[in-house]
Amino acid sequence: MLTLKRIQQCKLLNTIHTTYNTSLVFDIIDMARTRTYIAGEWDGDLNAIDQLYRWNEGDKWNMHFTDAHKNGQCYDTSMPCTIKASLSERLGRSKTFILVVGNNTNTTRKGACSYQNCDNKQFNYFTGQFSCKVIGKSYSTESFIDYECRLAYNAWLRNEMKIVVLYNAASVNRSKCPEKLRNVGTHVEMKSYNYNWQEYRYDYQKVKKAIEG
């Protein structure tokens, strides 16, 4: 016959067991939703971004890439503030932020809002300025890359984001990196000299170590 004390002990053990399993389930779900976000100057560094995809699709990695620039038509036809809202949502599901840096990364202005023929602007009578209904602030001069870097940096400050900066070159030149990420995260060149091919080629092991390390 179970005593009152024994019944209480059983209830306590069952509570601990249930709590542990619930926590474990949530940990597994969180891991399953991990994303790796790729940003870069699509026009100039397509070769480097494509190389990351080839490595991942070749079963070398097991990452869920979120490439904000994959749908080029969306970038050409949608309003910048609408796109930035989508970028913010995608970044919110990501644990790792990869920025591919090339010659034009720090100077491109694609994505800077101009509020020309935009249906998402509204006049704020308190400030006397137009503001964006999507991102909730006034005129934005940030490019898409600047916007992504700022969000990634803020997430990094909260210990929610790992930042990896990959240079589409054989050396690291931080002056080409947007200032927001210039001194944070891991900075690695993507290319090394291959003596067999007698040329600079993308270095899988070096990039893998930077992303997974």
Question: How would you describe each model-predicted region?
Answer:
Residues 2-4, 10-97, 101, 208-213:
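Conserved N-terminal substructure of TIR/SEFIR domains
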